Structure formats: structure tokens, C-alpha cells
């Protein structure tokens, strides 16, 4: 038995006596409210947009298909136990149930967008349900790697100023660690070292043609050139009861994704055996990112770790399908993808990879290729399930164990009724070889191989800091956390705005009102 009740705001609340039933109702409600949005989301995250919108989206689909391995995601889904499969299968069943109603009565139920663009919605699979999360949170937001862009910058600095001065200018623009930078983990709670300089490496420069190709790939990935994007991210503050007039624990989370219609997020209540979860989440994910279950509350902001490294592969000048590793030539792996294109014949593409990972760019002029090694590759579904598992935690003791399962990067926050607050930078991060400068592509010939991943205990994190609050605006996590591909932090940081606004003691209403003072135009 599945029942959907809507509150006074129209937000659906799903009631069922099984987990599968809850997710079946969730999928049905999403298809009822956001059919076109969800259809285009899963097409965008799986590279199937040109199939319905035509050749203008072929380059986008090519970029998406080349940036993940569908067989890996499918294998992870197949390997799940039935309880975990119930989440994805139930969601797809409910979505497809509503879709069948729409297709049976299109005159009254078909969303207008399908009529405008001239195509029909199709059924989704459990894999599609997972890919909406994987394609955005993993393949996009956890896939930041600026080494190629930095290599371009280094080349321009050297070209303009000569080798030594050019390197000095580059180091000044891409510094390692400013110890004066505001942090989310208070200094008294995390007294780590703050090294100032990276080791020097000398990767092969990037050719002009390869640089131009990379800039276009980045434009496709981001939707615009990076310099043209408005700043977006998220902020949050958590305050312990001793600093709240009403004696309550407060968590205020301000996601700053930008303005969209329909909204980037979807509000939902999930009520099943032993749980009552209410909140909202981007793209109607299976995980409710910003929510409470009556015992605990949790939230997120964009994390800034470094879980993806770019390796510079040295190619055989006579055969660019071969790369050098440990003194021998190795054949790249190859797979072919067929992209359906509305109004024309299908297009076949080739996707190459080395033992490091997918090849993101090939510089034929300089006989190099650039492969992505991701700490979270093959762990996407486990990461999602860890996040889902955290929704059912009822105390601080059980929450971190679920967060530790997440290999993809994100800032995660926790608060409970007992007055506990906590923060952790989730994700699994590489244990790099000595001499590795993560600002630039690592030498792929064997000297710079990862030694594994670091344990979760080494991630920046804090529980109940002495100051009585936790705040973040996508700032530096801890004093010994180096600058990353996403952010280059300094003493001037917008976190200071939150810290200045937080009074020594405040009412719940005052803490909620701070959102008006710290919201961006997006």
C-alpha cells in the first residue's frame, strides 16, 4: 500500500510499509510533478540529448559519453543486494507507472514541453535513477581537475616572462596554502601543518591546438567558459543549544545553485517503516540532501577536496594508441559508443582509456595524452548508498560510518536534538607519491603512481567545536588543507561574513534570518 498526500504547499509526502513502496511513491510523485525535467536530466547525465533535440547537442553527448563508463555503473547496480536494489527499482516502477498514465491520456496529461519539442517520454531504468546522481554529483561536481588548465597557464607565464620568472609568477597565482585563510574546522580543534610550496615538476607543455580543444571541452562541461560563470555554491551554519535562546540545536543550509524554473531542488517527505524523512534535494535524487528525520538533521555544501588527478601519458610517436609505463609500451583500451541523433544517422565515437582512467585529451603535436584517475571510480553506487544510509541514522554514533562510505567529495554536516553538531569533508583522497605537484599533470610513466587512498579519519572534520558553532561558505576546511582545483583560498574569504553575523547568543528566528544577509544573487 502506497499513499501520497500533499501538504498545503503541494509538497508530496509518501507513506508506505516497505522501503520499495516508499521509493515507488517517490518516483510516481516526481513523474507527476517534473516529468520533462527528470527526463532531460537523465538524458543529460547519460549523453542522450541529441536523440531528441538533434545535432546541436552531439558535441555535448560526445563529451558526456567520454567521461564515464556505463558498464561500470551497470555492474555496480547488478551487484547490489535486494534491499538496495529496491531503492532504484521502486523509484523506476513508480515513475514508469505515472508515465503509463500520461501516455494513455496525452491530451490531458502530457507536459507542454514534449509538444513543443516534438518527442515522447520513455520509460526509465534503475540505472537511470542512479545516473541522475552519478552524472551530477560524481561525474561533474566530484570531477574537478584543473591540471590541464594550469599547464596552459604555466606555459603562458613562461612564454611571457621566461622559465624562472614565469614559474615564480605561476606559483604566485596558484599558491599552495595561506595559513591566514579562515577555516571551517577551528584552529584550536585542528592544529595541522601548513606547508607553503609544492615540489617542482616539469610536464611536457601543451600545444596551442590541444589547449583550444580543452577549452571547448570545459565550455561543454560547465555550460559556459569558466570566466563567464556567476559564482555559485552553498553556505551553512550550525549552532549548539548553549548559544541559542530557545536552547535548541540549529542547522541552516543555504544551497546556491542558481535560479531555475522548475526549481533545481525537489521537496519530498518519505515516511516508511521506522523513518520519517522530510526535506529537498537536487534533481529528485534518491538521497534527500537537505533534510531531517525527526532525530537528526543534515546538510551539504560543495566540497573542495582533490580526488581526481590528471596523468600525462607519453605516447609512442609512431602509434598514439600506445603509452609508456614502467619502461614498456602499453596499448590503450578502447570502447565504441553509438550516439543517436534526431534527424540524421547515428554517430559512432571511440572512448580511450589507460590504466589510470579515461583519456580526457590527446595532444597529437606533443605526443601526450591526459588520463583521469578518480579515487571514486567503481565506487559511485556505494557512495550514493552511504549517503542514503545516513538518512536513517538516529544519532551521531551511526552517522559518520555512513559518510565514510562516500568516495566522492562533498562537505557534510550533522545536527541532533541532543545538541551535537559535526562537519566532515567526505570523500576518499589519494595517497600520492613524493614529488607529486597536484596543480599540474603527473608523469604517467610510473614514478607518480598513487599508493592507495587515505583513511576517512585523515579528512578534515570536527564534532562539537569549543566555539559552539560550525560555518562554511565553500571555504578552506582546515588549516593544513591545501588549495584545490575548485578554490584558491586566501585570508580574504566570504566565510568572514557569516562569522561576523553570528551573535554570541541568538534566537532561532535570528539564525534563520541570517540567510537574507548571506545569499548570493544566484
What are the functions of these language-model segments?
Residues 15, 23-24, 133, 247-248, ...:
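Short helix/loop capping segments that flank catalytic or ligand/cofactor-binding pockets
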Residues 123-134, 138, 265-270, 304-307, ...:
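Short secondary-structure boundary/capping segments
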Residues 22-25, 71-88, 373, 384-390, ...:
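Second-shell loop/turn segments in exported
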Residues 79-101, 236-242, 247, 256-258, ...:
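Structured, non-membrane catalytic/scaffold regions adjacent to prosthetic-group chemistry
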Residues 139-145, 151-168, 209, 380, ...:
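Ordered core of a single globular domain
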Residues 2-250, 255-261, 274, 281, ...:
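Substrate-recognition/specificity elements adjacent to catalytic centers across diverse enzyme folds
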Residues 368, 408-504:
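Hydrophobic alpha-helical segments
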Residues 276-345, 388-392, 499-502:
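Compact, glycine/acidic-enriched structural inserts
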Amino acid at each position: 500500500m502506497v499513499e501520497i498526500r500533499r501538504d498545503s504547499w503541494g509538497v508530496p509526502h509518501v507513506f508506505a510499509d516497505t522501503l520499495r513502496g516508499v521509493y515507488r511513491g517517490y518516483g510516481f510523485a516526481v513523474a507527476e510533478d517534473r516529468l520533462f525535467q527528470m527526463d532531460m536530466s537523465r538524458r543529460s547525465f547519460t549523453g542522450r540529448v541529441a536523440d531528441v533535440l538533434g545535432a546541436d547537442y552531439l558535441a555535448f553527448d560526445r563529451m558526456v559519453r567520454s567521461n564515464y563508463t556505463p558498464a561500470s555503473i551497470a555492474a555496480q547496480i547488478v551487484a547490489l543486494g535486494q534491499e538496495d536494489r529496491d531503492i532504484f527499482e521502486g523509484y523506476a516502477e513508480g515513475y514508469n507507472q505515472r508515465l503509463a498514465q500520461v501516455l494513455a491520456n496525452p491530451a490531458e496529461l502530457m507536459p507542454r514541453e514534449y509538444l513543443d519539442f516534438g518527442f515522447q517520454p520513455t520509460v526509465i531504468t534503475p540505472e537511470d535513477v542512479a545516473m541522475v546522481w552519478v552524472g551530477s554529483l560524481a561525474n561533474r561536481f566530484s570531477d574537478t581537475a584543473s591540471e590541464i588548465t594550469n599547464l596552459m597557464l604555466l606555459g603562458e607565464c613562461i612564454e611571457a616572462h621566461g622559465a624562472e620568472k614565469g614559474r615564480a609568477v605561476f606559483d604566485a597565482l596558484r599558491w599552495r596554502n595561506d595559513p591566514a585563510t579562515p577555516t571551517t574546522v577551528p584552529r584550536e580543534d585542528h592544529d595541522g601543518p601548513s606547508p607553503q610550496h609544492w615540489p617542482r615538476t616539469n610536464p611536457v607543455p601543451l600545444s596551442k591546438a590541444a589547449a583550444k580543444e580543452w577549452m571547448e571541452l570545459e565550455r561543454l562541461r560547465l555550460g559556459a567558459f569558466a570566466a563567464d560563470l556567476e559564482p555559485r555554491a552553498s553556505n551553512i551554519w550550525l549552532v549548539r543549544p548553549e548559544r541559542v535562546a530557545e536552547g535548541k540545536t540549529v542547522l541552516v543550509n543555504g544551497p546556491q545553485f542558481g535560479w531555475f524554473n522548475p526549481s533545481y531542488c525537489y521537496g519530498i517527505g518519505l515516511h516508511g517503516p521506522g523513518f520519517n524523512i522530510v526535506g529537498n534535494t537536487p534533481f529528485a535524487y534518491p538521497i534527500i540532501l537537505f533534510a531531517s528525520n525527526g532525530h537528526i538533521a543534515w546538510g551539504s555544501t560543495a566540497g573542495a577536496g582533490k580526488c581526481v588527478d590528471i596523468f600525462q601519458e607519453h605516447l609512442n610517436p609512431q602509434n598514439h594508441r600506445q603509452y609508456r609505463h614502467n619502461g614498456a609500451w602499453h596499448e590503450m583500451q578502447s570502447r565504441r559508443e553509438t550516439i543517436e541523433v534526431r534527424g540524421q544517422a547515428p554517430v559512432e565515437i571511440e572512448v580511450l582509456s589507460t590504466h589510470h582512467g579515461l583519456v580526457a585529451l590527446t595532444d597529437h603535436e606533443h605526443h601526450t595524452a591526459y588520463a583521469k584517475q578518480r579515487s571514486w571510480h567503481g565506487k559511485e553506487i556505494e557512495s550514493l548508498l552511504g549517503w542514503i544510509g545516513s538518512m536513517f541514522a538516529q544519532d551521531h554514533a551511526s552517522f559518520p560510518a555512513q559518510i565514510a562510505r562516500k568516495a566522492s567529495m562533498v562537505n557534510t554536516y550533522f545536527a541532533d536534538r541532543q545538541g551535537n553538531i559535526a562537519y566532515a569533508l567526505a570523500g576518499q583522497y589519494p595517497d600520492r607519491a613524493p614529488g607529486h605537484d597536484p596543480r599540474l599533470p603527473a608523469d604517467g610513466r610510473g614514478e607518480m603512481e598513487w599508493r592507495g587512498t587515505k583513511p576517512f579519519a585523515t579528512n578534515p572534520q570536527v564534532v562539537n567545536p569549543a566555539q559552539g558553532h560550525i560555518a562554511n561558505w565553500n571555504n578552506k576546511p582546515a588549516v593544513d588543507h591545501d588549495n584545490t582545483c575548485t578554490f584558491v583560498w586566501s585570508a580574504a574569504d566570504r566565510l568572514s561574513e557569516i562569522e561576523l553575523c553570528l551573535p554570541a547568543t541568538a534566537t532561532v528566528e535570528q539564525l534563520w534570518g541570517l540567510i537574507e544577509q548571506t545569499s548570493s544573487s544566484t
